[in-house]
Amino acid sequence: MTAKKLKVGETGIIKEINFDNRIQYRRMMDLGFIPNEEITCCNKTFGSTAFEVKGTKYGIRNEDAINILLK
């Protein structure tokens, strides 16, 4: 399952993040999107989704959210 498939209010645990671009991968890791971290879907809009990680909310493009795999 990917982070994009979470519904508003649902929580998941990050299994891994898969980005071909090394810079994008590092950026997500720096924001706290790391394996075994809890992620909550806060809001969905056309083209992006808001997630909460470690108490901070981030707007992530849906095309990036499909690269965040959950347990």
What are these regions (language model features)?
Residues 1-2, 71:
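Absolute protein N-terminus
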Residues 23-27, 44:
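Short alpha-helix capping/helix-loop boundary micro-motifs
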Residues 43-71:
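C-terminal structural segments of small proteins and small subunits
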Residues 11-24:
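Short, structured beta-strand/loop micro-motifs enriched in basic residues and often containing a Trp
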